[in-house]
Amino acid sequence: MESYHYPYAAVERAMKIQEVILRAMDGRLKWYQAAEILGISDRQMRRWKLRYQHWGYDGLIDRRRKRPSPRRVPVEVVKEVMTLYRERYFDFNVLHFHQKLKEDHGIELSYSWVKNLLQTAGLVAKGKRKSPHRKARPRRPLRGMLLFVDASTHRWIPSLDGMQDLIVVLDDATTEVYYARLVPQENTLTTMQALRAVVEQRGVFCALYTDMASHFVTTRTANAPHRSQKPAGPTQIQRALGQLGIELIEAHSPQARGRMERLWETWQGRLPMELRLKGINTWDAANEFLTTTWLPFHNRTWSVAPQCPESAFVPLNGQDLDRIFALHHTRVVGNDNCIQFANLKLQIPPCQWRYSFAKCQVTVYRHLDGTISIGYGPHTLGRYDSQGHLLSPSQKAA
């Protein structure tokens, strides 16, 4: 095939004409408006349109070509692609849309061609200039050496008003996601639920990488002049991780958590659109989709093999996760064997091995299931529902 080298001005003019024609074909412009933009008559506009349909982009530069390019995409396919994007996949990014074209519609076009078409037609914004090159941090060689936990506030379920928080636990060695769940708010309890689920399923891991949120680390300055000089204690999550021997590593910038930030960029550009296509509009259905469909897809598509096949996860060795992953509060028992906690008066039941617990210091545990228990050393003195009513042994087991 002959090679043509066109002047830059001719190429630039052809690109402008193509962009206007594509916008008119997509219905974003009337044909007479396209003619006005290009500064030509309606009759000339019709000629340009026919030349583009017959010769493709080359026809906009040189109409002396004798035959269409064998690689030219038919105009009907161009219209179908733009219609699909405009009417069904309008909120998809280019890569996601390109995959859907191939998987669901049998349209096999190159990613660059689809991207250029959508950008030229004004259906997607042109990409930003790439940031300066940075050296990637090496992955940890074993599963379980370093895990990330983070949450993203986003409109994950498009059919619901407002935002939802999505909590994710990710392995640095493989980019495998072990846990993902939509919650009304990321806080100490919802984060503990995520960590407990991973520990129960996988075992105890070595280190956890987090941001500087207040439920992970104490962000106040203990020696500030306007604050109490009392040393700042560990957060509930720091205490729980310490009991399991897990190191907490604090990230001081989003760039330090690059692997997690890239996951959010990918998920925000895909997951809401998948939920919309499936017609999912409830929290329960969305979380079911996450567990049964989305996580297997993510781990199959984006996870990588670790450098070493061994695992750094350690099996549980009798640790009481029910106590570890609970909120701990210290109280002193009153003379009536009651304690005050969260506007509740909790009565300690009679005990065979001690006459009274008056003046004793006990620990109150607020568990992840909403129940409350009172602990004295290794002993549980009583367990209560969220309203402070003492539970029977059968109710405790349930």
Q: Language model features by range: what are they?
A:
Residues 1-3, 11, 31-84:
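Short, basic alpha-helical/linker "hinge" immediately adjacent to a nucleic-acid-recognition surface
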Residues 1-10, 392-398:
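Intrinsically disordered, low-complexity and often Lys/Arg-enriched segments
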Residues 76, 107-108, 119-177, 184-206, ...:
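Mobile-element integrase/transposase regions
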Residues 56-155, 226-232, 311-321:
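Basic, flexible linker segments flanking DNA-binding modules
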Residues 292-398:
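C-terminal, beta-rich DNA-binding module of retroviral/retroelements integrases
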Residues 195, 199-229, 251-254:
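Acidic/histidine-rich, metal-coordinating catalytic segments
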Residues 230, 236-308, 312-324:
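Charged alpha-helix within mobile-element recombinases
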Residues 20, 34, 45-48, 56, ...:
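Mobile genetic element proteins and their domesticated derivatives, centered on retroelements
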